[in-house]
Each structure stands twice: as structure tokens, then as C-alpha cells.
């Protein structure tokens, strides 16, 4: 298996934009990459305002929204609670099954979690349990300003304590007027966690196009570093199968 698990330090930090943009960029580079978000609350999968629809648009995958996200519900709560309140039972086994179905279509998947790693996800698992099953390297999406050092370092420590590899951090929503503080936070995160900050993605104000997002990702994220992970994972997978 290859790809990335995109998590964050909080909700509404920019995971979907980052996941969709990275998948779109790698697809432009010729990689057969898909996107997967097992559970979505706040919108049903077909809603154009929801994460599944935005992942589809940004990545450019042919996959239907309800295959990108097989379990979705409108109530904006932690997925486990939202599903429970709706009388729906979703297990870790269920979402791994759908993950494996997507792998029949793509060589690699960029998987988006929900909120942070300790979010109650399925009825029997947290987000981190799902990440541990997949064993994909993590990309941590974080806010760029006040409080982000603490949140990001804690997230990385929690991931490492659970045996996960963290490929890097992307600070999302960076404004030009705050860049001095953003750069200081970048340096502190790297020093305290030992994990590189691979990008400072700008703040997108108002409506934005797929092209604008992908061009920003190419300009502000170290795509070549992430490409090394994809290549290394593919090499390991090929070697293991021989």
C-alpha cells in the first residue's frame, strides 16, 4: 500500500484542500492516485459543499462521491456520535473494506481523516486506530498562528507513540501579514518534533478555483519530498510481493 493519511490538529484546518490538492498534483505528474474519506459528518457525500465533493473536484478522480465517502451524514458532530444518533452502525472493518475496494481502482490513496487523531470515528475505533491499520505515512495539517506549536507537537508525539510515521507538517491558511510569526512557528515545530514542515499554504479568500489551489500547492508545498515517500513505499511494496 502507498499514499498518505492526511490528519490535522483540529477541525476546519484545511485537510480537504490539502488532500485534494496533493492528489490533484500527483495525478498531473502521472501517478494513479485516488482519494478516500471513510466518514463524513456535516454534509451528505453528494452535497457540493461537503468534503467528498471537494476532494473529487480538486483531485480530478473519476470516483463517485459516495464511493470516495461511503458513510456520510448531515449532522455536524464527531462521526461516531453522528452515526449513533442516526441509528447507523459503522465499524473499523467496514471502512477498511471500502478502502480496499478503492485500491482495486488506484495504485495509491490519499486518505483524509476527520478532525484530529483522537476523534471518535467508527463505533469501535478512533481516527488513529484507522491510521494504524493502514500504516500510511501521516501528513499533519495545522493552523499557522497562535497555539499551533503546542497542538502540532502533541499530535506528532501521539502519532509516534502509536508507531506511526509522520512525513511532515503543512501549515494551512497562511496570510502574508502574519508570515514572520508563521516562520517562527515553523522553526519551533521542526525543532521540537523533529518533523519537517513541508509547506506554508496560503489563505484562500472567498471563492477559489481548482487551478488556483493546485498552483499554490505546487508553489508552496515540497512536492518532491512527498514524491520520495510514494516512490519508496512503491519500491517496498514491490519488493515484498516478490
Curated annotation (Swiss-Prot):
Gene3D superfamilies attached to this UniProt entry: P-loop containing nucleotide triphosphate hydrolases (3.40.50.300)
Annotated catalytic residues: 37
Enzyme Commission identifier(s): 6.3.3.3
Protein residues bound to ATP: 12-17, 51, 112-115
Subcellular location: Cytoplasm
InterPro entries: DTB_synth_BioD, P-loop_NTPase
PANTHER family: ATP-DEPENDENT DETHIOBIOTIN SYNTHETASE BIOD 2, DETHIOBIOTIN SYNTHETASE
Protein name: ATP-dependent dethiobiotin synthetase BioD
UniProt gene name: bioD
Amino acid at each position: 500500500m502507498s499514499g498518505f493519511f492526511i490528519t490535522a490538529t483540529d477541525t476546519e484546518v484545511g485537510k480537504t484542500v490539502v488532500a485534494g490538492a496533493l492528489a490533484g498534483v500527483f495525478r498531473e505528474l502521472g501517478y494513479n492516485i485516488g482519494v478516500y474519506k471513510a466518514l463524513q459528518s456535516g454534509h451528505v457525500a453528494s452535497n457540493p459543499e461537503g468534503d467528498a465533493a471537494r476532494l473529487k473536484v480538486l483531485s480530478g478522480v473519476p470516483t463517485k462521491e459516495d464511493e470516495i465517502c461511503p458513510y456520510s451524514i448531515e449532522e455536524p458532530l464527531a462521526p461516531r456520535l453522528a452515526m449513533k444518533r442516526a441509528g447507523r452502525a459503522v465499524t473499523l472493518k467496514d471502512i477498511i473494506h471500502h478502502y480496499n475496494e478503492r485500491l482495486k481502482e488506484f495504485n495509491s490513496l490519499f486518505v483524509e481523516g476527520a478532525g484530529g487523531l483522537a476523534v471518535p470515528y467508527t463505533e469501535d475505533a478512533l481516527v488513529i486506530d484507522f491510521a494504524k491499520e493502514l500504516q500510511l505515512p501521516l501528513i499533519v495539517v495545522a493552523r499557522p498562528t497562535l497555539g499551533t506549536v503546542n497542538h502540532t507537537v502533541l499530535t506528532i508525539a501521539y502519532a509516534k507513540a502509536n508507531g506511526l510515521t509522520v512525513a511532515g507538517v503543512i501549515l494551512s491558511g497562511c496570510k502574508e501579514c502574519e508570515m514572520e510569526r508563521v516562520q517562527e512557528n515553523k522553526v519551533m515545530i521542526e525543532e521540537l518534533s523533529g518533523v519537517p514542515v513541508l509547506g506554508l499554504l496560503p489563505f484562500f479568500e472567498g471563492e477559489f478555483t481548482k487551478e488556483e489551489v493546485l498552483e499554490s500547492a505546487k508553489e508552496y508545498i515540497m512536492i518532491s519530498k512527498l514524491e520520495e515517500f510514494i516512490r519508496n513505499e512503491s519500491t517496498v511494496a514491490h519488493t515484498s510481493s516478490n
